[in-house]
Amino acid sequence: MRKELKYLICFNILLLLSIIYYTFDLLTLCIDDTVKDAILEEDLNPDAPPKPQLIPKIIHQTYKTEDIPEHWKEGRQKCLDLHPDYKYILWTDEMAYEFIKEEYPWFLDTFENYKYPIERADAIRYFILSHYGGVYIDLDDGCERKLDPLLAFPAFLRKTSPLGVSNDVMGSVPRHPFFLKALKSLKHYDKYWFIPYMTIMGSTGPLFLSVIWKQYKRWRIPKNGTVRILQPAYYKMHSYSFFSITKGSSWHLDDAKLMKALENHILSCVVTGFIFGFFILYGEFTFYCWLCSKNFSNLTKNWKLNAIKVRFVTILNSLGLRLKLSKSTSDTASATLLARQQKRLRKDSNTNIVLLKSSRKSDVYDLEKNDSSKYSLGNNSS
């Protein structure tokens, strides 16, 4: 096997391993294992007496101010009417800031410097659930039945489409290990991905929470540290569902439309990916052919350390410095220049060029031997 091919294979293996290492959590999201932790029918509608409630009866919601938009008031009121025995807290931006400042000062700098307000709205919900416990509900989610059956689990999230979990409805006991892990991971995932939609999703949104959930499941989960998953049928659109949805996603910017369009054209995205992969492979094949070519071999022979020295000294001399090359370095550079001149001449002529060595008589030099290191360019002789 040619050494060039070995180098190329090793490079591709290292590249592939690096990609797998940095995207492993995203790749694992392709495996839908939410069924293992699903909240079942018998859990929500038990024949026996209901299980004791673990999650505190607190409903948390967030908004910029206390002036909630009109189209969300009906859903909010439904939650209040169905749960008169629950404590209700609407977290405004000012309340969230003061809470982080007083209880989690180590996170205040990150909290203040989030690029998008929705990132702060996402982050605060993890902190309040970890600190107080209870159920967090987005303002665009209206309640359709009592939440009491969901309080029997240490923590719950809801499954989202097509993969992973969402952060619009969540419940937890105080200091649940999953939400503690989420808090500790927020700083690490605070990265700007150039596209607002991906930045929000990956730093604090559902994608972030899904990645943390996958990592958490690889831990040795403590006995009381399980996270149960509310399935889509129990989330909305059925008579037995817990929630209904009104107009939401107020944080979506223009780029979100593109991302949603891509979700609706999965096949086109896959085909585009294959085409892109083909061009990458073709580029690597072209690069390999160049490595194996004579041009590359000549290039590696000519570009020696002495040639680099010549260029470096030339640059310094042009700046006003007066540096001289050693005789051996100068001779090598001259030989390299001569070889390039001969190569250019050979393209235009098939005749022999006579080269004279300073201390020897004239010899006829055959261009095809390309032994330029022993000769200097002279006049033609018969």
Curated annotation (Swiss-Prot):
Q: Which residues cross the membrane?
A: 7-27, 270-290
Tell me which SUPFAM superfamilies the record gives: Nucleotide-diphospho-sugar transferases
Q: What happens when the gene is disrupted?
A: Leads to altered sphingolipid synthesis.
The membrane-topology field of this record reads: Multi-pass membrane protein
- Tell me one GO molecular function of this protein: inositol phosphorylceramide mannosyltransferase activity
The record's top EC class is transferase
Q: Which UniProt keywords apply?
A: Glycosyltransferase, Membrane, Phosphoprotein, Transferase, Transmembrane, Transmembrane helix
Any GO BP: mannosyl-inositol phosphorylceramide biosynthetic process
UniProt GO cellular component terms:
fungal-type vacuole; fungal-type vacuole membrane; Golgi apparatus; mannosyltransferase complex
Q: What is catalysed by this protein?
A: a 1D-myo-inositol-1-phospho-N-[(R)-2-hydroxy-very-long-chain fatty acyl]-(R)-4-hydroxysphingoid base + GDP-alpha-D-mannose = an alpha-D-mannosyl-(1<->6)-1D-myo-inositol-1-phospho-N-[(R)-2-hydroxy-very-long-chain fatty acyl]-(R)-4-hydroxysphingoid base + GDP + H(+)
Q: Does the keyword Ribosomal protein apply?
A: no
Chain ranges sitting on the Extracellular side read 28-269
Cellular location(s) = Membrane
Its EC number(s):
2.4.1.370
Q: Which InterPro entries match?
A: Glycosyltransferase_domain, GlycoTrfase_DXD_sugar-bd_CS, Nucleotide-diphossugar_trans
Instruction: List the stretches on the Cytoplasmic face of the membrane.
Output: 1-6, 291-382
Source domain of life = Eukaryota
Q: What does this protein do?
A: Involved in the synthesis of mannosyl phosphorylinositol ceramide. Catalyzes the addition of mannosyl to phosphorylinositol ceramide. Suppressor of RVS161 mutation.
Family, according to the entry, reads as follows:
Belongs to the glycosyltransferase 32 family.
Q: How does it assemble?
A: Heterodimer of SUR1 and CSG2.
* Protein name per UniProt: Mannosyl phosphorylinositol ceramide synthase SUR1
Q: Which organism is it from?
A: Saccharomyces cerevisiae (strain ATCC 204508 / S288c)
Q: What lineage does UniProt assign to this protein's organism?
A: Eukaryota, Fungi, Dikarya, Ascomycota, Saccharomycotina
